[in-house]
């Protein structure tokens, strides 16, 4: 069993977002990846991306808008995004949103313009 304590988890700061890697192949999980995503108020993804696996978003605090239709998801809610669905995420409230994300290990991401970006560093 692998325990990942918050202070030891790798953190990736991007404009308007913080990804904190939890479970992944390099952190003891062969089949699944999870990370915590913090979204600053007013943030909106500049472009959509798609993934080759289903992705699950569980909103722990705040609220977000997600997907091609910018569907709202509030604290305590979850969204299951099927593989191949264009994903955009944005803050939907006045405060910071916190989300736990889960997906199969080894997934690959493709940006809206067709650029393949593979697996991001918080999920390896």
Predicted regions mapped to residue ranges:
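Short, charged/polar surface micro-motifs in flexible loops or helix N-caps
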Residues: 27-31, 39-44, 63, 105-108
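Glycine-centered loop/turn positions within well-structured domains
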Residues: 54, 71, 87
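Asparagine-centered strand-capping/turn motif at beta-strand->loop junctions
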Residues: 89-92
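Short acidic-glycine-tyrosine-enriched beta hairpin
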Residues: 69-84
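A short, N-terminal "cap"/entry segment at the start of jelly-roll beta-barrel domains
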Residues: 1-31, 115-124
């Amino acid at each position: 069993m692998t325990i990942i304590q918050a202070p030891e988890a790798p953190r990736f700061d991007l404009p308007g977002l913080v990804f904190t890697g939890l479970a992944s192949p390099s952190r003891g999980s062969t089949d699944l990846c999870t990370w915590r995503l913090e979204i600053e108020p007013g943030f909106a993804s500049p472009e959509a991306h798609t993934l080759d696996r289903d992705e699950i978003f569980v909103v722990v605090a705040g609220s977000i808008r997600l997907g091609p239709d910018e569907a709202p998801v509030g604290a305590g809610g979850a969204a299951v995004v099927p593989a191949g669905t264009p994903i955009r995420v944005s803050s939907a409230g006045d405060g910071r949103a916190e989300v736990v994300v889960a997906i199969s290990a080894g997934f690959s991401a493709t940006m809206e313009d067709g650029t393949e970006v593979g697996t991001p560093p918080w999920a390896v």
